[in-house]
Protein backbone atom coordinates (compact mmCIF):
# COMPACT_ATOMS: atom_id res chain seq x y z
CA UNK A 1 0.00 0.00 0.00
CA UNK A 2 0.97 3.62 -0.46
CA UNK A 3 2.53 5.09 2.65
CA UNK A 4 1.83 8.74 3.34
CA UNK A 5 3.50 10.93 5.90
CA UNK A 6 2.06 14.04 7.46
CA UNK A 7 4.05 17.23 7.26
CA UNK A 8 3.34 20.63 8.68
CA UNK A 9 1.91 23.02 6.14
CA UNK A 10 3.22 26.55 5.65
CA UNK A 11 1.52 28.73 8.20
CA UNK A 12 -1.42 30.48 6.63
CA UNK A 13 -2.05 34.18 7.21
CA UNK A 14 -5.05 33.23 9.31
CA UNK A 15 -3.23 30.43 11.15
CA UNK A 16 -4.32 30.48 14.76
CA UNK A 17 -2.91 29.13 17.97
CA UNK A 18 -5.64 28.99 20.55
CA UNK A 19 -4.95 29.86 24.14
CA UNK A 20 -7.64 29.35 26.75
CA UNK A 21 -9.90 27.48 24.33
CA UNK A 22 -7.22 25.19 22.89
CA UNK A 23 -8.18 21.54 22.72
CA UNK A 24 -5.91 19.07 24.48
CA UNK A 25 -4.21 15.96 23.17
CA UNK A 26 -5.60 12.71 24.53
CA UNK A 27 -2.40 10.72 24.35
CA UNK A 28 -1.13 10.46 27.90
CA UNK A 29 -2.42 11.60 31.28
CA UNK A 30 -5.47 13.28 29.72
CA UNK A 31 -6.55 10.10 27.97
CA UNK A 32 -9.84 8.71 29.35
CA UNK A 33 -9.50 5.31 30.96
CA UNK A 34 -11.47 2.36 29.65
CA UNK A 35 -13.64 2.44 32.78
CA UNK A 36 -14.38 6.15 32.39
CA UNK A 37 -15.23 5.61 28.72
CA UNK A 38 -17.74 2.92 29.67
CA UNK A 39 -19.20 5.22 32.29
CA UNK A 40 -19.35 8.14 29.85
CA UNK A 41 -21.53 6.13 27.44
CA UNK A 42 -23.35 4.25 30.24
CA UNK A 43 -22.10 0.87 29.00
CA UNK A 44 -21.63 -2.22 31.13
CA UNK A 45 -18.97 -3.50 28.73
CA UNK A 46 -17.55 -3.00 25.24
CA UNK A 47 -16.96 -6.42 23.76
CA UNK A 48 -13.93 -7.19 21.62
CA UNK A 49 -16.11 -8.03 18.61
CA UNK A 50 -17.88 -4.67 18.76
CA UNK A 51 -14.84 -2.88 17.41
CA UNK A 52 -15.13 -4.70 14.10
CA UNK A 53 -16.65 -1.66 12.44
CA UNK A 54 -17.50 -2.32 8.79
CA UNK A 55 -16.75 0.41 6.27
CA UNK A 56 -16.69 0.94 2.54
CA UNK A 57 -15.56 3.93 0.50
CA UNK A 58 -16.99 5.50 -2.64
CA UNK A 59 -14.75 8.05 -4.33
CA UNK A 60 -15.52 10.33 -7.28
CA UNK A 61 -12.84 11.82 -9.53
CA UNK A 62 -12.92 13.68 -12.83
CA UNK A 63 -10.96 12.34 -15.78
CA UNK A 64 -8.76 15.09 -17.18
CA UNK A 65 -6.09 15.53 -19.83
CA UNK A 66 -2.41 16.09 -18.91
CA UNK A 67 -3.13 19.83 -19.17
CA UNK A 68 -6.10 19.63 -16.81
CA UNK A 69 -8.91 19.83 -19.37
CA UNK A 70 -12.07 17.83 -18.72
CA UNK A 71 -12.09 14.63 -20.75
CA UNK A 72 -14.47 14.65 -23.70
CA UNK A 73 -14.15 10.94 -24.38
CA UNK A 74 -16.60 8.25 -23.38
CA UNK A 75 -16.07 5.92 -20.44
CA UNK A 76 -13.14 3.62 -21.32
CA UNK A 77 -14.40 0.18 -22.33
CA UNK A 78 -11.41 -1.40 -20.59
CA UNK A 79 -12.99 -0.36 -17.27
CA UNK A 80 -16.13 -2.35 -18.00
CA UNK A 81 -19.79 -1.37 -17.99
CA UNK A 82 -20.90 1.63 -15.95
CA UNK A 83 -24.26 -0.10 -15.53
CA UNK A 84 -23.03 -3.38 -14.07
CA UNK A 85 -19.43 -3.04 -12.83
CA UNK A 86 -19.77 -2.98 -9.02
CA UNK A 87 -16.41 -1.27 -8.48
CA UNK A 88 -15.94 1.27 -11.29
CA UNK A 89 -18.79 3.35 -12.67
CA UNK A 90 -19.64 6.97 -13.39
CA UNK A 91 -21.57 9.54 -11.42
CA UNK A 92 -23.17 12.50 -13.23
CA UNK A 93 -20.82 12.75 -16.19
CA UNK A 94 -19.05 10.35 -18.51
CA UNK A 95 -15.94 12.13 -17.24
CA UNK A 96 -16.76 11.72 -13.53
CA UNK A 97 -15.54 8.31 -12.41
CA UNK A 98 -16.84 6.68 -9.25
CA UNK A 99 -14.83 4.02 -7.44
CA UNK A 100 -16.62 1.71 -4.99
CA UNK A 101 -14.89 -0.63 -2.55
CA UNK A 102 -16.36 -3.64 -0.87
CA UNK A 103 -17.19 -3.39 2.83
CA UNK A 104 -14.32 -4.37 5.12
CA UNK A 105 -13.61 -4.71 8.82
CA UNK A 106 -9.91 -3.92 8.38
CA UNK A 107 -9.17 -0.35 7.34
CA UNK A 108 -6.04 -1.52 5.53
CA UNK A 109 -8.08 -3.89 3.35
CA UNK A 110 -10.54 -1.15 2.41
CA UNK A 111 -7.83 1.31 1.43
CA UNK A 112 -5.87 -1.41 -0.36
CA UNK A 113 -8.87 -2.15 -2.57
CA UNK A 114 -9.38 1.56 -3.25
CA UNK A 115 -5.73 1.82 -4.23
CA UNK A 116 -6.07 -1.23 -6.47
CA UNK A 117 -9.03 0.34 -8.28
CA UNK A 118 -6.99 3.50 -8.82
CA UNK A 119 -4.02 1.61 -10.22
CA UNK A 120 -6.18 -0.57 -12.48
CA UNK A 121 -7.96 2.52 -13.81
CA UNK A 122 -4.88 4.67 -14.38
CA UNK A 123 -3.18 1.96 -16.43
CA UNK A 124 -6.21 1.79 -18.74
CA UNK A 125 -6.99 5.44 -19.38
CA UNK A 126 -6.35 6.68 -22.91
CA UNK A 127 -4.52 9.80 -24.08
CA UNK A 128 -2.40 10.04 -20.91
CA UNK A 129 -5.48 11.03 -18.92
CA UNK A 130 -5.28 11.27 -15.15
CA UNK A 131 -7.57 11.80 -12.18
CA UNK A 132 -8.33 15.27 -10.85
CA UNK A 133 -7.60 15.04 -7.14
CA UNK A 134 -9.63 18.02 -5.90
CA UNK A 135 -13.33 18.24 -5.13
CA UNK A 136 -13.82 21.48 -7.03
CA UNK A 137 -13.51 20.84 -10.77
CA UNK A 138 -10.89 21.79 -13.30
CA UNK A 139 -11.39 24.80 -15.56
CA UNK A 140 -14.65 24.27 -17.46
CA UNK A 141 -15.45 25.64 -20.88
CA UNK A 142 -19.21 25.46 -20.68
CA UNK A 143 -22.22 23.21 -20.17
CA UNK A 144 -21.84 21.68 -23.64
CA UNK A 145 -18.40 20.38 -22.68
CA UNK A 146 -19.73 18.30 -19.77
CA UNK A 147 -20.97 14.98 -21.21
CA UNK A 148 -23.80 13.32 -19.27
CA UNK A 149 -23.12 9.73 -18.21
CA UNK A 150 -24.49 6.98 -20.45
CA UNK A 151 -25.55 3.55 -19.23
CA UNK A 152 -26.57 1.74 -22.40
CA UNK A 153 -29.81 1.02 -24.23
CA UNK A 154 -31.77 -0.93 -21.62
CA UNK A 155 -34.65 0.83 -19.91
CA UNK A 156 -32.84 0.85 -16.57
CA UNK A 157 -29.79 2.35 -18.27
CA UNK A 158 -31.90 4.98 -20.01
CA UNK A 159 -33.55 5.83 -16.69
CA UNK A 160 -30.17 6.47 -15.07
CA UNK A 161 -29.20 8.82 -17.89
CA UNK A 162 -32.59 10.56 -17.80
CA UNK A 163 -32.17 11.20 -14.07
CA UNK A 164 -28.91 12.98 -14.85
CA UNK A 165 -30.57 14.97 -17.63
CA UNK A 166 -33.11 16.04 -15.05
CA UNK A 167 -30.34 17.18 -12.70
CA UNK A 168 -28.81 19.11 -15.58
CA UNK A 169 -32.07 20.87 -16.41
CA UNK A 170 -32.81 21.65 -12.76
CA UNK A 171 -29.42 22.72 -11.43
CA UNK A 172 -27.07 22.95 -14.40
CA UNK A 173 -24.25 20.62 -15.31
CA UNK A 174 -21.44 22.56 -13.68
CA UNK A 175 -22.62 21.95 -10.12
CA UNK A 176 -22.67 18.22 -10.85
CA UNK A 177 -18.94 18.10 -11.67
CA UNK A 178 -18.02 18.46 -7.99
CA UNK A 179 -16.42 15.31 -6.58
CA UNK A 180 -16.45 13.91 -3.06
CA UNK A 181 -15.94 10.86 -0.90
CA UNK A 182 -18.81 8.85 0.59
CA UNK A 183 -18.01 6.81 3.68
CA UNK A 184 -20.28 3.85 4.39
CA UNK A 185 -20.33 2.76 8.04
CA UNK A 186 -22.02 0.03 10.05
CA UNK A 187 -21.52 -1.68 13.38
CA UNK A 188 -20.90 -5.45 13.35
CA UNK A 189 -23.90 -7.73 13.69
CA UNK A 190 -22.58 -9.06 17.00
CA UNK A 191 -22.91 -5.59 18.51
CA UNK A 192 -26.65 -5.15 18.19
CA UNK A 193 -28.22 -7.92 20.34
CA UNK A 194 -25.91 -7.20 23.28
CA UNK A 195 -26.30 -3.44 22.97
CA UNK A 196 -30.07 -3.84 22.81
CA UNK A 197 -29.93 -5.84 26.03
CA UNK A 198 -27.76 -3.20 27.71
CA UNK A 199 -30.24 -0.51 26.68
CA UNK A 200 -33.14 -2.51 28.11
CA UNK A 201 -34.97 -2.46 24.79
CA UNK A 202 -37.60 -5.18 24.36
CA UNK A 203 -38.68 -4.47 20.79
CA UNK A 204 -37.53 -6.21 17.62
CA UNK A 205 -33.83 -6.17 16.80
CA UNK A 206 -34.58 -4.61 13.40
CA UNK A 207 -36.44 -1.69 14.96
CA UNK A 208 -33.75 -1.22 17.60
CA UNK A 209 -30.97 -1.13 15.02
CA UNK A 210 -32.92 1.29 12.84
CA UNK A 211 -33.71 3.62 15.73
CA UNK A 212 -30.09 3.64 16.86
CA UNK A 213 -28.85 4.48 13.37
CA UNK A 214 -31.33 7.37 13.32
CA UNK A 215 -29.94 8.32 16.74
CA UNK A 216 -26.47 8.40 15.12
CA UNK A 217 -27.74 10.44 12.17
CA UNK A 218 -29.27 13.12 14.41
CA UNK A 219 -25.99 13.57 16.26
CA UNK A 220 -24.07 13.56 13.00
CA UNK A 221 -26.24 16.40 11.72
CA UNK A 222 -25.61 18.40 14.88
CA UNK A 223 -21.84 18.06 14.65
CA UNK A 224 -21.10 17.52 10.95
CA UNK A 225 -19.76 21.08 10.74
CA UNK A 226 -16.74 19.79 12.67
CA UNK A 227 -15.90 17.34 9.86
CA UNK A 228 -16.23 20.19 7.37
CA UNK A 229 -13.73 22.25 9.35
CA UNK A 230 -11.26 19.39 9.81
CA UNK A 231 -11.41 17.85 6.33
CA UNK A 232 -12.81 20.55 4.05
CA UNK A 233 -10.48 20.98 1.07
CA UNK A 234 -12.40 23.32 -1.22
CA UNK A 235 -11.73 26.92 -0.08
CA UNK A 236 -11.40 28.18 -3.66
CA UNK A 237 -12.60 27.46 -7.18
CA UNK A 238 -11.88 28.34 -10.78
CA UNK A 239 -13.87 31.35 -11.99
CA UNK A 240 -15.37 29.14 -14.68
CA UNK A 241 -17.27 27.27 -11.97
CA UNK A 242 -19.46 30.28 -11.14
CA UNK A 243 -19.81 31.70 -14.64
CA UNK A 244 -23.23 33.35 -14.90
CA UNK A 245 -24.17 32.61 -11.28
CA UNK A 246 -24.59 34.93 -8.32
CA UNK A 247 -22.01 34.40 -5.60
CA UNK A 248 -20.29 36.12 -2.67
CA UNK A 249 -16.76 34.90 -3.36
CA UNK A 250 -13.75 37.19 -3.51
CA UNK A 251 -11.12 37.31 -6.23
CA UNK A 252 -7.80 35.74 -5.29
CA UNK A 253 -6.25 36.14 -8.72
CA UNK A 254 -7.27 36.44 -12.36
CA UNK A 255 -8.58 32.89 -12.46
CA UNK A 256 -9.53 32.07 -8.86
CA UNK A 257 -12.37 32.92 -6.49
CA UNK A 258 -12.28 32.13 -2.78
CA UNK A 259 -13.28 33.16 0.71
CA UNK A 260 -10.47 33.93 3.20
CA UNK A 261 -11.78 31.60 5.92
CA UNK A 262 -13.64 29.08 3.73
CA UNK A 263 -13.27 25.37 4.35
CA UNK A 264 -15.56 23.45 2.02
CA UNK A 265 -17.31 25.44 -0.72
CA UNK A 266 -18.50 22.10 -2.09
CA UNK A 267 -20.96 21.88 0.83
CA UNK A 268 -22.14 25.49 0.51
CA UNK A 269 -24.46 27.40 -1.77
CA UNK A 270 -22.17 26.83 -4.77
CA UNK A 271 -22.11 23.09 -4.26
CA UNK A 272 -24.71 20.40 -3.74
CA UNK A 273 -27.56 22.70 -2.86
CA UNK A 274 -31.09 23.04 -4.12
CA UNK A 275 -33.14 26.18 -3.57
CA UNK A 276 -36.26 24.06 -3.98
CA UNK A 277 -35.17 21.82 -1.10
CA UNK A 278 -34.21 24.60 1.32
CA UNK A 279 -37.57 24.57 3.07
CA UNK A 280 -37.78 20.77 3.14
CA UNK A 281 -37.76 19.50 6.74
CA UNK A 282 -36.78 15.86 6.74
CA UNK A 283 -37.27 14.27 10.14
CA UNK A 284 -34.78 11.70 11.44
CA UNK A 285 -36.69 10.85 14.61
CA UNK A 286 -38.58 7.93 13.10
CA UNK A 287 -38.02 5.88 9.95
CA UNK A 288 -41.66 6.11 8.89
CA UNK A 289 -41.61 9.90 9.20
CA UNK A 290 -38.35 10.05 7.23
CA UNK A 291 -39.82 7.87 4.50
CA UNK A 292 -43.04 9.90 4.43
CA UNK A 293 -41.11 13.17 4.04
CA UNK A 294 -39.16 11.88 1.06
CA UNK A 295 -42.13 10.06 -0.43
CA UNK A 296 -44.17 13.26 -0.33
CA UNK A 297 -41.35 15.18 -2.03
CA UNK A 298 -41.21 12.50 -4.74
CA UNK A 299 -44.94 12.84 -5.41
CA UNK A 300 -45.37 16.62 -5.18
CA UNK A 301 -45.03 18.51 -8.44
CA UNK A 302 -42.88 21.63 -8.41
CA UNK A 303 -43.97 24.45 -10.76
CA UNK A 304 -40.44 25.39 -11.81
CA UNK A 305 -39.73 21.80 -12.80
CA UNK A 306 -43.08 21.47 -14.60
CA UNK A 307 -41.96 24.41 -16.72
CA UNK A 308 -39.01 22.37 -18.02
CA UNK A 309 -41.47 20.50 -20.23
CA UNK A 310 -40.24 18.14 -22.91
CA UNK A 311 -37.62 18.25 -25.64
CA UNK A 312 -38.15 19.47 -29.20
CA UNK A 313 -38.99 15.93 -30.30
CA UNK A 314 -41.24 15.31 -27.32
CA UNK A 315 -38.68 13.30 -25.38
CA UNK A 316 -38.67 13.54 -21.56
CA UNK A 317 -36.08 15.88 -20.04
CA UNK A 318 -36.41 14.52 -16.50
CA UNK A 319 -37.92 11.49 -14.79
CA UNK A 320 -40.84 13.58 -13.53
CA UNK A 321 -41.62 17.15 -12.47
CA UNK A 322 -41.72 16.41 -8.75
CA UNK A 323 -39.63 18.12 -6.09
CA UNK A 324 -37.45 15.01 -6.10
CA UNK A 325 -37.18 12.79 -9.17
CA UNK A 326 -36.08 9.98 -6.86
CA UNK A 327 -34.61 9.46 -3.39
CA UNK A 328 -31.01 10.23 -4.34
CA UNK A 329 -31.86 13.78 -5.37
CA UNK A 330 -32.33 14.76 -1.73
CA UNK A 331 -29.11 16.50 -0.76
CA UNK A 332 -27.91 15.63 2.73
CA UNK A 333 -24.64 15.23 4.61
CA UNK A 334 -25.63 11.70 5.64
CA UNK A 335 -28.12 9.07 4.47
CA UNK A 336 -29.68 5.97 6.02
CA UNK A 337 -29.04 3.10 3.63
CA UNK A 338 -29.88 -0.50 2.87
CA UNK A 339 -28.77 -2.83 0.11
CA UNK A 340 -31.70 -3.15 -2.29
CA UNK A 341 -33.01 -6.13 -4.19
CA UNK A 342 -33.22 -5.98 -7.96
CA UNK A 343 -36.00 -3.62 -8.99
CA UNK A 344 -36.63 -2.43 -5.43
CA UNK A 345 -36.83 1.27 -4.56
CA UNK A 346 -34.48 2.46 -1.76
CA UNK A 347 -37.30 3.77 0.43
CA UNK A 348 -39.25 0.54 0.08
CA UNK A 349 -36.15 -1.43 1.07
CA UNK A 350 -35.64 0.75 4.15
CA UNK A 351 -39.24 0.39 5.27
CA UNK A 352 -39.17 -3.37 4.75
CA UNK A 353 -35.80 -4.26 6.26
CA UNK A 354 -34.75 -1.23 8.29
CA UNK A 355 -31.49 0.70 8.16
CA UNK A 356 -28.46 -1.48 7.41
CA UNK A 357 -25.73 1.15 7.33
CA UNK A 358 -25.23 4.90 7.00
CA UNK A 359 -23.51 6.87 4.25
CA UNK A 360 -21.48 9.97 5.17
CA UNK A 361 -21.51 12.46 2.30
CA UNK A 362 -19.76 15.51 3.77
CA UNK A 363 -16.16 14.68 2.82
CA UNK A 364 -13.99 16.47 0.28
CA UNK A 365 -11.20 14.78 -1.61
CA UNK A 366 -7.89 15.63 0.05
CA UNK A 367 -5.67 16.60 -2.91
CA UNK A 368 -2.54 15.99 -0.83
CA UNK A 369 -3.37 12.28 -0.54
CA UNK A 370 -3.10 9.84 -3.48
CA UNK A 371 -6.46 8.25 -2.65
CA UNK A 372 -8.12 11.42 -1.32
CA UNK A 373 -8.39 9.79 2.12
CA UNK A 374 -6.04 7.82 4.37
CA UNK A 375 -6.08 5.45 7.34
CA UNK A 376 -5.74 8.21 9.91
CA UNK A 377 -8.81 10.05 8.63
CA UNK A 378 -10.69 6.76 8.51
CA UNK A 379 -9.88 6.05 12.15
CA UNK A 380 -11.12 9.48 13.14
CA UNK A 381 -14.34 8.99 11.17
CA UNK A 382 -14.95 5.71 12.98
CA UNK A 383 -14.31 7.43 16.31
CA UNK A 384 -16.68 10.26 15.43
CA UNK A 385 -19.44 7.91 14.26
CA UNK A 386 -19.15 5.56 17.24
CA UNK A 387 -19.48 8.62 19.49
CA UNK A 388 -22.55 9.79 17.56
CA UNK A 389 -24.07 6.34 18.08
CA UNK A 390 -23.34 5.98 21.79
CA UNK A 391 -23.76 9.56 23.06
CA UNK A 392 -27.22 10.94 23.95
CA UNK A 393 -29.17 12.12 20.89
CA UNK A 394 -32.41 14.01 21.60
CA UNK A 395 -35.08 14.03 18.93
CA UNK A 396 -34.73 16.80 16.38
CA UNK A 397 -37.36 19.49 15.88
CA UNK A 398 -37.83 21.82 12.95
CA UNK A 399 -36.11 24.84 14.51
CA UNK A 400 -33.01 22.80 15.31
CA UNK A 401 -33.01 21.27 11.82
CA UNK A 402 -32.62 24.69 10.22
CA UNK A 403 -30.24 25.89 12.95
CA UNK A 404 -27.97 22.95 12.12
CA UNK A 405 -28.09 23.88 8.43
CA UNK A 406 -27.11 27.46 9.25
CA UNK A 407 -24.19 26.29 11.41
CA UNK A 408 -22.95 24.19 8.52
CA UNK A 409 -23.12 27.14 6.14
CA UNK A 410 -21.17 29.33 8.54
CA UNK A 411 -18.37 26.78 8.87
CA UNK A 412 -18.33 26.23 5.11
CA UNK A 413 -17.78 29.93 4.48
CA UNK A 414 -15.98 31.10 7.64
CA UNK A 415 -14.75 27.97 9.42
CA UNK A 416 -11.16 29.13 9.95
CA UNK A 417 -12.21 32.50 11.37
CA UNK A 418 -11.03 32.35 15.01
CA UNK A 419 -13.97 34.54 16.07
CA UNK A 420 -16.67 32.44 14.38
CA UNK A 421 -19.85 31.98 16.40
CA UNK A 422 -22.39 29.22 15.87
CA UNK A 423 -25.82 28.66 17.38
CA UNK A 424 -26.71 25.93 19.87
CA UNK A 425 -30.39 25.68 20.81
CA UNK A 426 -30.83 29.34 19.91
CA UNK A 427 -27.87 30.58 21.96
CA UNK A 428 -24.56 31.76 20.47
CA UNK A 429 -21.54 29.53 21.05
CA UNK A 430 -17.95 30.03 19.89
CA UNK A 431 -17.13 27.46 17.23
CA UNK A 432 -13.59 26.86 18.58
CA UNK A 433 -14.80 26.26 22.13
CA UNK A 434 -17.60 23.96 20.95
CA UNK A 435 -15.24 22.01 18.70
CA UNK A 436 -12.78 21.59 21.58
CA UNK A 437 -15.58 20.21 23.74
CA UNK A 438 -16.64 17.70 21.07
CA UNK A 439 -13.07 16.56 20.46
CA UNK A 440 -12.64 16.09 24.19
CA UNK A 441 -15.70 13.85 24.30
CA UNK A 442 -14.42 11.86 21.33
CA UNK A 443 -11.52 10.74 23.49
CA UNK A 444 -13.89 8.25 25.12
CA UNK A 445 -14.79 6.64 21.79
CA UNK A 446 -11.10 6.56 20.83
CA UNK A 447 -10.33 4.76 24.10
CA UNK A 448 -12.97 2.11 23.39
CA UNK A 449 -11.68 1.49 19.87
CA UNK A 450 -8.03 1.48 20.93
CA UNK A 451 -8.81 -0.99 23.70
CA UNK A 452 -9.69 -3.66 21.15
CA UNK A 453 -7.23 -2.75 18.39
CA UNK A 454 -4.00 -3.12 20.33
CA UNK A 455 -1.47 -5.89 19.78
CA UNK A 456 -0.50 -8.73 22.12
CA UNK A 457 -2.99 -7.59 24.72
CA UNK A 458 -1.63 -4.04 24.85
CA UNK A 459 -3.85 -0.98 24.62
CA UNK A 460 -3.62 0.53 21.15
CA UNK A 461 -2.83 4.15 20.35
CA UNK A 462 -3.91 4.56 16.73
CA UNK A 463 -7.37 6.04 17.37
CA UNK A 464 -6.09 8.44 20.04
CA UNK A 465 -3.31 9.45 17.65
CA UNK A 466 -5.82 10.10 14.85
CA UNK A 467 -7.85 12.21 17.26
CA UNK A 468 -4.77 14.19 18.30
CA UNK A 469 -4.09 15.03 14.66
CA UNK A 470 -7.52 16.66 14.48
CA UNK A 471 -6.96 18.47 17.79
CA UNK A 472 -3.85 20.00 16.24
CA UNK A 473 -5.95 21.29 13.33
CA UNK A 474 -8.31 22.99 15.74
CA UNK A 475 -5.41 24.62 17.56
CA UNK A 476 -3.76 25.71 14.30
CA UNK A 477 -6.07 26.25 11.33
CA UNK A 478 -3.15 26.27 8.88
CA UNK A 479 -2.96 22.49 9.35
CA UNK A 480 -6.42 21.94 7.84
CA UNK A 481 -6.50 20.97 4.15
CA UNK A 482 -8.30 24.23 3.31
CA UNK A 483 -5.74 26.30 5.22
CA UNK A 484 -2.89 24.40 3.66
CA UNK A 485 -4.24 24.92 0.13
CA UNK A 486 -4.78 28.66 0.52
CA UNK A 487 -1.36 29.10 2.11
CA UNK A 488 0.34 27.29 -0.77
CA UNK A 489 -1.62 29.27 -3.36
CA UNK A 490 -0.70 32.56 -1.70
CA UNK A 491 2.92 31.68 -0.87
CA UNK A 492 3.71 30.31 -4.32
CA UNK A 493 1.49 32.62 -6.37
CA UNK A 494 -0.61 29.76 -7.74
CA UNK A 495 -4.18 29.86 -8.97
CA UNK A 496 -6.51 27.14 -7.73
CA UNK A 497 -6.24 25.44 -11.11
CA UNK A 498 -2.44 25.50 -11.04
CA UNK A 499 -2.28 24.07 -7.53
CA UNK A 500 -4.87 21.37 -8.21
CA UNK A 501 -3.17 20.36 -11.47
CA UNK A 502 0.24 20.21 -9.79
CA UNK A 503 -1.12 18.01 -7.01
CA UNK A 504 -3.03 15.79 -9.46
CA UNK A 505 0.19 15.15 -11.39
CA UNK A 506 2.03 14.35 -8.17
CA UNK A 507 -0.59 11.83 -7.05
CA UNK A 508 -0.75 10.35 -10.56
CA UNK A 509 2.99 9.69 -10.40
CA UNK A 510 2.77 8.24 -6.89
CA UNK A 511 0.02 5.83 -7.90
CA UNK A 512 1.71 4.71 -11.11
CA UNK A 513 5.02 4.35 -9.29
CA UNK A 514 3.40 2.17 -6.64
CA UNK A 515 1.79 0.12 -9.41
CA UNK A 516 5.12 -0.47 -11.16
CA UNK A 517 6.85 -1.42 -7.92
CA UNK A 518 4.06 -3.87 -7.10
CA UNK A 519 3.98 -5.51 -10.55
CA UNK A 520 5.66 -8.71 -9.41
CA UNK A 521 3.77 -9.06 -6.16
CA UNK A 522 1.14 -11.76 -5.83
CA UNK A 523 -1.33 -9.28 -4.36
CA UNK A 524 -0.99 -6.90 -7.30
CA UNK A 525 -1.43 -9.68 -9.85
CA UNK A 526 -4.46 -11.00 -7.99
CA UNK A 527 -6.01 -7.51 -7.96
CA UNK A 528 -5.24 -7.06 -11.64
CA UNK A 529 -6.84 -10.36 -12.56
CA UNK A 530 -9.90 -9.76 -10.40
CA UNK A 531 -10.62 -6.26 -11.75
CA UNK A 532 -10.03 -7.49 -15.30
CA UNK A 533 -12.50 -10.35 -14.87
CA UNK A 534 -15.09 -8.09 -13.27
CA UNK A 535 -14.78 -5.52 -16.07
CA UNK A 536 -15.14 -8.18 -18.77
CA UNK A 537 -18.08 -9.84 -17.01
CA UNK A 538 -19.82 -6.49 -16.54
CA UNK A 539 -19.80 -5.90 -20.29
CA UNK A 540 -21.37 -9.33 -20.81
CA UNK A 541 -23.92 -8.62 -18.08
CA UNK A 542 -24.94 -5.35 -19.72
CA UNK A 543 -25.26 -7.05 -23.10
CA UNK A 544 -27.47 -9.73 -21.54
CA UNK A 545 -29.74 -7.11 -19.97
CA UNK A 546 -30.02 -5.25 -23.26
CA UNK A 547 -30.86 -8.46 -25.15
CA UNK A 548 -33.94 -9.04 -23.01
CA UNK A 549 -37.34 -7.87 -24.28
CA UNK A 550 -37.95 -4.25 -23.28
CA UNK A 551 -41.09 -2.19 -22.90
CA UNK A 552 -41.06 1.01 -24.87
CA UNK A 553 -39.34 3.57 -22.64
CA UNK A 554 -42.36 5.87 -22.20
CA UNK A 555 -44.42 2.96 -20.83
CA UNK A 556 -41.55 1.86 -18.61
CA UNK A 557 -41.15 5.41 -17.28
CA UNK A 558 -44.87 5.75 -16.56
CA UNK A 559 -44.87 2.46 -14.65
CA UNK A 560 -41.75 3.47 -12.71
CA UNK A 561 -43.29 6.79 -11.68
CA UNK A 562 -46.52 5.06 -10.64
CA UNK A 563 -44.70 2.59 -8.38
How does the language model describe each region?
Residues 137-139, 238-241, 401-411, 460-472:
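A glycine-rich phosphate-binding loop feature that marks nucleotide/adenosyl-phosphate handling sites
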Residues 456-563:
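Extended, compositionally biased alpha-helical segments that mediate assembly or anchoring
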